[in-house]
């Protein structure tokens, strides 16, 4: 076996294994949490857009969704070990969310730059306070959701690792 090749669990009772439907449910829950984060932020700042509240909220959330899904997948947030015990739920969620918050802010700033002037992207347009608030908010919201899912899955399926 090649030591650099990732090990894919072959049996359902491996601690790394998650059924496909559960990956889908957790990913969907993550996306809903991030859309809720964007909706709360837009409401707090009374942001409106010509595309309407739903499309505007999804457009605001999209960079954060991409950042979270990529980092959570890369850091093991969608494996069986990401949901038990609670210390591991917290560790894997916070590890990815602390990186996804700043990356989401950066992606959002890049997306909002005029497409013809992307070369003129300026770092000084990103407020450090927004990075901090977004990162903490995303981390807390995702942690609450993932801890709730972790507890629910253990109640429904006690045989899970």
Give the positions of each predicted feature.
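Juxtamembrane/disordered regions of integral membrane proteins
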Residues: 2-161
């Amino acid at each position: 076996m090649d030591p650099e090749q990732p090990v894919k669990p072959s049996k359902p009772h491996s601690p790394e294994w998650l059924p496909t439907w559960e990956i889908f449910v957790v990913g969907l829950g993550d996306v809903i949490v991030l859309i809720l984060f964007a909706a709360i932020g837009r409401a707090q700042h009374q942001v409106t857009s010509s595309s309407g509240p739903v499309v505007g909220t999804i457009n605001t959330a999209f960079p954060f969704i991409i950042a979270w899904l990529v980092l959570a997948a890369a850091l093991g947030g969608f494996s069986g070990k990401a949901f038990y015990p609670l210390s591991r739920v917290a560790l894997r969620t916070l590890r990815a969310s602390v990186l996804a918050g700043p990356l989401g802010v950066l992606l959002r700033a890049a997306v909002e730059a005029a497409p013809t002037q992307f070369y003129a992207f300026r770092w000084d347009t990103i407020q450090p306070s927004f990075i901090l608030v977004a990162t903490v908010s995303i981390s807390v919201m995702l942690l609450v959701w993932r801890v709730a899912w972790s507890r629910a899955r253990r109640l429904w399926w006690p045989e899970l690792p």
